[in-house]
A protein has these predicted regions:
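A residue-level detector for a conserved hydrophobic packing site
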Residues: 3-4
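Short helix-loop "hinge" at the ATP-lid/N-box region of the Bergerat-fold HATPase_c
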Residues: 13-18
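Short beta-strand/loop element within the Bergerat-fold HATPase_c
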Residues: 25-39
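Acidic ATP/Mg2+-coordinating residue in the GHKL
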Residues: 47
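Short conserved segment of the HATPase_c
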Residues: 52-64
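Conserved glycine-/histidine-rich ATP-lid loop and adjacent helix of the Bergerat-fold HATPase_c
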Residues: 80-90
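Glycine-rich ATP-binding loops of the HATPase_c
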Residues: 89-103
Length: 120
């Protein structure tokens, strides 16, 4: 299903960023939260891999844009994820960098937020 592919794309990107940016002896976190906000189901997926460079954050949903080595990334995963959420599911997908606290420790990383309209 397309929605599962979106979630897997985001989680796999977070995993890759964690492996690249966080040493083996540090916490590697991917936190997923689901909640309702107004008439939307909101799904937040965040990691502690130090965030997306602010110089490129506005480009990551563009087709063929990748920061990975050519053998690892095609640059279409996040583009297709955005297309699925916005065009097929009539939702919204955003990315931002965020600070958060988990188990009394402070972290910084990328946060992908999916808004999906729901009927009440």
């Amino acid at each position: 299903n397309e929605f599962i592919q979106v979630i897997l794309n985001i989680i796999n990107n977070a995993k890759d960023a964690l492996i690249q940016n966080i040493s083996d002896n540090e916490d590697r976190l991917i936190i997923i939260k689901l909640y309702q906000k107004q008439n939307n189901l909101v799904i937040s997926i965040k990691d502690n891999a130090h965030g997306v460079n602010e110089k490129i954050i506005d480009k990551i949903f563009q087709p063929y844009f990748t920061t990975k080595h050519k053998s690892k990334g095609t640059g279409i995963g996040l583009f297709m994820s955005n297309e699925i959420i916005t065009k097929h599911m009539k939702g919204k997908l955003i990315v931002k960098n965020s600070n958060f606290t988990y188990n009394k420790n402070n972290y910084y990383g990328a946060e992908f937020i999916i808004y999906l309209p729901i009927k009440i």
